[in-house]
Amino acid sequence: MSGFLTSLDPRRVQWGAAWYAMHSRILRTKPVESMLEGTGATTAHGTKLAQVLTTMDLISLGVGSCVGTGMYVVSGLVAKEMAGPGVIVSFIIAAVASILSGVCYAEFGVRVPKTTGSAYTYSYVTVGEFVAFFIGWNLILEYLIGTAAGASALSSMFDSLANHTISRWMVDSVGTLNGLGKGEQSYPDLLALVIAIIVTIIVALGVKNSVGFNNVLNVLNLAVWVFIMIAGFFFINGKYWAEGQFLPYGWSGVLQGAATCFYAFIGFDIIATTGEEAKNPNTSIPYAITASLVICLTAYVSVSMILTLMVPYDTIDTESPLMEMFVARGFYAAKFVVAIGSVAGLTVSLLGSLFPMPRVIYAMAGDGLLFRFLAHVSSYTETPVVACIVSGFLAALLSLLVSLRDLIEMMSIGTLLAYTLVSVCVLLLRYQPESDIDGFVKFLSEEHTKKKEGILADCEKEVCSPVSEGEEFSGPATNTCGAKNLPSLGDNEMLIGKSDKSTYNVNHPNYGTVDMTTGIEADESENIYLIKLKKLIGPRYYTMRIQLGLPGKMDRPTAATGHTVTICVLLLFILMFVFCSFIIFGSDYISEQSWWAILLVVLMVLLISALVFVILQQPENPKKLPYMAPCLPFVPAFAMLVNIYLMLKLSTITWIRFAVWCFVGMLIYFGYGIWNSTLEISAREEALHQSTYQRYDVDDPFSVEEGFSYATEGESQENWGGPAEDKGFYYQQMSDTQPNTRTSSKAKSKSKHKQNSEALIANDELDYSPE
C-alpha cells in the first residue's frame, strides 16, 4: 500500500483536484429558496421590479411578439423560397414543436414563478450553472437578433411604402458597404437603427407604459387581420394549389421551412421572463403560453392560405408580401390599410423581442455570470435600465449591418437549443427524489405557500395532536378544521388539486395524513388520459401495468432511480442527434432503400424507444404543481426530437455563426462568470469563515465542530444566552499562518475537562466571542 502511495504523481493528483473543483463549479445549482426569499424583495441595487402584469397582458405580449414578424415577413419568405403553399404545413409543424416546448416552459414557469430570466433561471435551479449560462447566452442572442430583425423589417416596409425611395437615397447619399450581410449592394440601414433606438427608449421607460403601448398596437393588428381575411376572400384562386403546385419544393422544403417558421412562434418565452412582474404567475404563465400559441397558429395558417391563393408562390414579394399581394390584384387602397397593420404588428413584435432581453441580462448579471453593473434597476422606471440601453444599442447596430434572412435563420438555432434543454430539464426534475424541503410548498409562489402552510398547520393542531395524559383514545380523529378553512380559499382547487381531494378529504377519518389504502387509483383518479385508457382496455389495465413494470402510486424516486433517468436522458439526447443527422444527411440512402440504412434507422428507433420505456418505468416525484406537463416522458422526449431535427435543417453558415457566438460566451463565462458568480462568492466566504473560526465544547475544549452564531452588532457577551455552563462552548479565532496545534485527547476524562473549564471561567480567562 505504501508503495502505491509513493508511486502517485503529485502533478496528477493536482490535476485531479483541479478538475474536481471545476466540475463542482459548472454543475452547482442555485437554491430555489434563494429565489423565493427574493420574491417581492428589493434587488441588490435597492429597487424591485413592479408586479403589474395581468393574464391578458401576458397573452398580449406573447401574441404581439410572435404575430408581427411571423405574419408580415416570415409567411412570404418561406412560401417563396422554401415551401410554396406548403408553408401552411410548415407553420403547423413548427406550431407542434412550439406547443410541446410550451407545455414544458409552462411547468417550469409554475415551479419558479417569481423570476426573471426564463429558461436561464429554470436551468440554473435544476441542471447547473454552466448549462444555465449557455442557455441564457443563447436567449440573449435570440432576443438580440429578434429586435434587429424587427427593426430591419419595419425599415423594409417603410421603404416599400415609399416605392423604394429610401433605399435609393441611402445608396446615393451614404454609399454601399459590401460584405456586411445585406447583399452585393448593401447599405447601412440608418432607418432601422433609428427605429431600434426609439423602441429601446419606450421599453426603458417602464413595464406598464410599454405593455399599454403593446396592447393598443395588438388591437390595431387584430382589426387589420380581419380586413385581410374578408378582402382576400374575394380574390382567391384555387388554381394556385393545383396538382404539383402545393409542394413545389417537396417535403424537404416543407421541413426546412418549418425550421424557419419556428422563428414565428418563439415569442411565447417572453411570458416566462415576466414571472417577477406578473400578479399571479402560477396561473397566468401556463394559460398565457397556451393561448398565445393557439392564437398565433390561427393567424399564420389563415394568412398563408389567403396569400398563396391570391398570387402564385414564385411571385410573392419577400419584403412586404401582404401589401404587395393586394397590389398584384389591383386593390391599391388595401395596401395602405395593410400598411397600418404592418406598422402595428412589426412594432409590437420588435417590442416583444426587446422586452425580455434586458430581463435575461438583468438575471444573469444579478447572479454574477455577467458584469454586475448590468443588473442596475432604475428607481424611477423600476426597469433594468442599463441592460435596456446596452442591449438596445447592440440590436440597433446589428440591424444596421445584417440582412433580414440571415437574422431570422440565426435566431432560430439558439431558440431551438434553449427549448430542447428546457424539455431535458423537465424530464430530469420530474424523476428526481424529494429534497429535504417539501417540494410542493417549495416551488409555489409566496401567497400560495402561506395558504398551503396555513391549511396544514390548522389541521395538524386538531388531527395530528397527541392524546393528552389521562385521556382515552376514542378512535380515529375527525376533521373539524377543513370544513371551516378549505371552502374559504379561492385558490384551493389550484393549490391542492383535484387529485389530492381523496388524500386531504374533509370527510376522511384521517384528514391531513396520506391515504395509504387507495393505491394507484387515487393517484390517477383525475388523469383523463389514464381514465380513457382504462375504459379502452378494461380490467387488463392493472395487469398490463404490472407486466410492463410500471411504478405504482406508493413508489417513490430514489437517488438510484434519479441517476438512471439522468443517464437515460443524456443517452437519449445523443441518440436523437445522431438519428436526426442521419435522417437529414443520409436521406438519399434511405430513399434508395439501402439495407444498411434501413437497418440503422430501425436500430436507432428501437434504442430511442427503449430509453423512453426505461424512463417510463421509473417512479415520478409525487409532488403536485398547479400545472404539470402531461404524458411524461413522451411529450418532453418528442419535443426534444422535433427541436433537434429542426436545428439540423438550418444552413451551415448559421451553425458557424452560432459557434462563434458560443465561443465568445465561453470566454466570458470561464474568464469572468465562473469566478464572480454569487454562488462562488458565497462558497469563498464560507470557506474563509470555516478556516478562521473554530468551535470548542466546554466538555471537550479541543474538539472541532461546525456551526455557531455570531453576536449581533452592539450585543453584549452577557446576552449570548447565559453563562458558559448553559452555553457549553466558546469560540477562539485561528490565524491562517498559525494553525491550531492543540489536539483532542480521548484519554482525558470528561470530568477533567469540566474542571479545567470551571477554572478558566473563575479566572475570567474564557473568551466567548471572536477577537
From Swiss-Prot:
Biased-composition ranges for Basic residues? 745-754
Q: What does this protein do?
A: Imports 4-aminobutanoate (GABA) into lysosomes. May act as a GABA sensor that regulates mTORC2-dependent INS signaling and gluconeogenesis. The transport mechanism and substrate selectivity remain to be elucidated.
Question: Per the record, GO CC terms?
Answer: cytosol; lysosomal membrane; nucleoplasm; plasma membrane
Q: Name one Pfam family in it.
A: AA_permease_2
The membrane-topology field of this record reads: Multi-pass membrane protein
Ranges where the record places region Disordered: 712-771
Which residue spans traverse the membrane?
Answer: 58-78, 83-103, 130-150, 187-207, 216-236, 251-271, 291-311, 336-356, 360-380, 384-404, 407-427, 565-585, 596-616, 628-648, 655-675
Question: Which reaction equation describes what this protein catalyses?
Answer: 4-aminobutanoate(in) = 4-aminobutanoate(out)
Tell me where it mainly resides.
membrane
**What is the native source organism of this protein?**
Bos taurus (Bovine)
UniProt lists compositionally biased (Polar residues) regions at 732-743
* Cellular location(s): Lysosome membrane
Chain positions with Phosphoserine modification: 465, 468, 488, 757, 769
Q: What's the name of the protein?
A: Solute carrier family 7 member 14
| Keyword annotations from UniProtKB, A to Z | Amino-acid transport, Glycoprotein, Lysosome, Membrane, Phosphoprotein, Transmembrane, Transmembrane helix, Transport
User: Coiled-coil intervals in this record?
Assistant: none
Q: Kindly list the biological process annotations in GO that this record carries.
A: amino acid transport; gamma-aminobutyric acid import
What GO molecular functions are on record for this protein? amino acid transmembrane transporter activity; gamma-aminobutyric acid transmembrane transporter activity
Q: Which residues are glycosylated?
A: 282, 676
KW Membrane (keyword) present: yes
Q: PANTHER family attached here?
A: CATIONIC AMINO ACID TRANSPORTER-RELATED, INNER MEMBRANE TRANSPORTER YGJI-RELATED
Recorded family membership:
Belongs to the amino acid-polyamine-organocation (APC) superfamily. Cationic amino acid transporter (CAT) (TC 2.A.3.3) family.
